[in-house]
Every structure is written in structure tokens, then in C-alpha cells.
Amino acid sequence: TVFTKELCENNAKAEGVSNVRFAEGNAVRLPFADESFDAVTSNYVYHNISGRDKQKLLLETLRVLKKGGTFAIHDLMSKSRYGDMEAFVKKLKDMGCEDVRLIDTSNGLFMERKKAVWLDLGGSKLLVGRK
């Protein structure tokens, strides 16, 4: 599926949402100023973005988050894709982020275990916290 700006705008209109703006950009170099957003979220997207350094991608996402803003990034965070995420959580805390948690969702935290196994969600984790 190609998510055109028109498709996104039509979906927002159909849902009655008017306080959004759609922009095309590069996830590795987001076209937004530092601290532009109150919250950032992603659900199973980052593993599809090219580039080997997913932690760098996460830091770019946090760059555009306002101080005090909330983040929730859900993805297939296997060590081969993301590196040592426990060390990354510590790094975020050292940078001043609060309530940072890495929640294992590979066994169906948000769905029946049978469905999670069928979807092969090994390495699935939810990174949450506040900047």
C-alpha cells in the first residue's frame, strides 16, 4: 500500500480528525525542528526503515520530541536489529529521560499468545518513557 498524502487526509476526514498535518520525509533525518512534538509513537515501522543503526533512528525520533513529551515505540527489537537495548535504555535515562521501560511484547501482551506466535513476533518490544 502506498500511503499518499491524499489517502492520509481522506482517512483523517473519515475519522473526524482535523488537528493533524501530513508530511513526507526521511525517518533518519526528520524534516522538523528540535522539540516539535508533544508525543511520538510508532507501531512496527522502524524495522522496515533501511539503515543498520536503529538506535540512531530512535535518537532522531526523540530529537523532535518536546521536553516532557511521551514516547512509545513498538517494534521487532531483536539484538541483531537494534543492538543492546538494555544499554540503550540506560543511555536514555542518563540523557535525562524518565520512566523509560522496555516491555517484552513477544508473547502476546496485546493479543492472544496463539496469534502472537502465528505472527512470529520474536523480539517484539515496546519502548516507552518521557523526555
Regions found by a protein language model. Give the residues of each.
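A short glycine-rich, Lys/Arg-flanked "PGG" loop and its adjoining helix->strand segment in the class I
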Residues: 55-67
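Conserved beta-strand signature within the Rossmann-like core of class I S-adenosyl-L-methionine
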Residues: 68-75
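Class I SAM-dependent methyltransferase SAM/SAH-binding core
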Residues: 1-28
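Short "lid" loop at the C-terminus of a central beta-strand within the Rossmann-like core
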Residues: 76-81, 107
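Core SAM-dependent methyltransferase catalytic element
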Residues: 96, 109-131
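Conserved Class I S-adenosyl-L-methionine
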Residues: 83-104
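A short acidic, Gly/Pro-enriched loop at the edge of an enzyme's catalytic core
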Residues: 25-40
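A short SAM/SAH-binding and catalytic strip from SAM-dependent methyltransferases
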Residues: 38-52
